[in-house]
Amino acid sequence: MKYVATIGSFDGVHRGHQCLLQQVRSLADERGLKAMAITFAVSPKQVLGSNDVVLLNSAEERLTLLRQVGMDEVPMLEFTHEMAAMSARDFMSQVLRELLGVQVLVIGYDHRFGRGRTDGFDDYVRYGHELGIEVVRGEACVERGEAVSSTRIRTCIAEGRVSEASHLLGYNYKLCGTVVGGYKVGRKMGFPTANIHVKEGEKMLPADGVYAVFVRIDADGESKHVGMLNIGHRPTVNNGSERSIEVHILDFEGDLYGKSLCVEFVERLREERTFDSLDALMAQLESDKERVSRLKCL
C-alpha cells in the first residue's frame, strides 16, 4: 500500500494541523492513495530533554483526532535518541519509504526533521527526487494575521483564554480524569462538586479561575451537562498549596465518586479570589451559576 503522508508531533491537532491534513486527504483522493499522518507516541521535545513542555493532548486523544480528520493510517513512532541522530535523507529512505511506504510527502510550512533539523524544504525535495518520494509544501493556516500553532494555543490556555484556544483548536479544549474524594465544603454550601484527579504532566491545565464547562460523565458518554469548574487553591477554605480541579454540574444529582469525567472548557468567568466569608463565597457562586445559565454558547 502506498501513501500520501505528513509527519509531525501534531500536539493539539489544531486548525493549522487540520488544514495540512485536509491537503493530505485531498491529494490522496486525487492520486488514488491512502492518507497517513505520522506522529510520535512521546513528543520529540520531551525525549530530547525539554521536560517543561506540557502537551495539549494525550497520545490517545491525538490518535482519535487524527482519525476524525480523515487519516487512514496513523503510525505512532517511538522517537529515540538514535532516531534523532538520523539524517533527513536516511529518515526519508529507511523510515518513510521502506518502512511506511510513503509515495508523496506533504511538509508543513515550517516543519523540519532530521539530525539537528538543519535541512529545509529544498533539501527534502532533492532527497525525495533521489528516493522516488514526491515532496509537496503544505500551506499555512493564518488566523488574525498569525499562524495557528501549538505554542500560540498553549499561551492562551496558560492565560485562561480558553474560548480563544478552543477557536484555534477547532474544538473545545478538554481535561479528563477520575472523581476522587474531597473536603465536601461545596456540598455544605449547596454547591456539591466533583474533585477531578488528572494525571500529572499529561495535559496542560488552564490558569487558575472559574470556568463555564460542558461535562461528560464516564468520559465518553453521549450526553453533555452544563457545569462550572474551579481550578486553583481554594483560598477561602484554606486548601493550602495544593492545586485542585472541582466541577459543579448544574441540575444534576447523583454519586460521581470513582467515575471518569471529561470537561470541555467554554469560557472563563473570573479569576480565583479570596472571600471574607463563606456567605460571600456562596453569593458569588450563585452569581457564577446565573451567568453560566445565561451563556448563549451553552
Regions found by a protein language model. Give the residues of each.
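Glycine-rich, Lys/Arg-enriched anion-binding loops that position phosphate/diphosphate groups
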Residues: 128-230
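N-terminal Rossmann-like or analogous alpha/beta NTP/dinucleotide-binding catalytic cores
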Residues: 46-131
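Phosphate/ribose-recognition catalytic cores of enzymes acting on nucleotide-derived substrates
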Residues: 182-298
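Residue-level signal for inorganic ion chemistry
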Residues: 14, 66, 105, 165, ...
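A non-catalytic, amphipathic alpha-helix used as a structural packing/dimerization or gating element
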Residues: 19, 23, 61, 164-171, ...
